[in-house]
């Protein structure tokens, strides 16, 4: 199966976008932006690169730049069972927001290593962090 190269087109010039997903319908895709995904409803399987991991409401995923990914909702995978459809909120940001020589700047070492690890996908299971991020996402204008 091919990977959809997704271009994020903005109505205005910005390096960061908040995108609500009332349901997960995109095929396996990738984009240059990093993506912080909050799973706000439902459960299913998340494919990031070559890895597969279950997700559920309250989970947070951080996906690296140009990493193929897909979210498959259990309601779609098992239509005969009574699963709630999945939904999420994504914050996508362009790599250009970081300094060009990020790895050489001591104050950015933690961020540099986090961005490197995001090439494999990072999962966070912190309910307090989820609630804080959800409130912050909702305060950002969409797109």
How should these model regions be labeled?
Residues 1-61, 67:
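Generic protein-terminus/edge-of-domain signal
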């Amino acid at each position: 199966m091919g990977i959809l190269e997704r271009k994020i087109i903005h109505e205005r010039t910005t390096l960061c976008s908040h995108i609500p997903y009332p349901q997960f319908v995109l095929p396996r895709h990738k984009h240059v932006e990093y993506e912080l995904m909050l799973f706000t409803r439902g459960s299913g399987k998340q494919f990031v690169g070559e890895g597969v991991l279950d997700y559920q409401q309250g989970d947070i995923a951080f996906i690296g730049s140009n990493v193929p990914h897909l979210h498959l909702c259990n309601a779609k995978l098992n239509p005969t069972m009574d699963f709630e459809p999945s939904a999420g909120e994504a914050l996508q940001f362009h790599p250009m927001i970081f300094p060009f020589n990020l790895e050489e700047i001591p104050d950015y070492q933690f961020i540099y290593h986090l961005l490197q690890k995001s090439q494999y996908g990072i999962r966070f299971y912190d309910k307090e962090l989820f609630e804080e991020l959800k409130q912050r996402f909702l305060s950002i204008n969409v797109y």
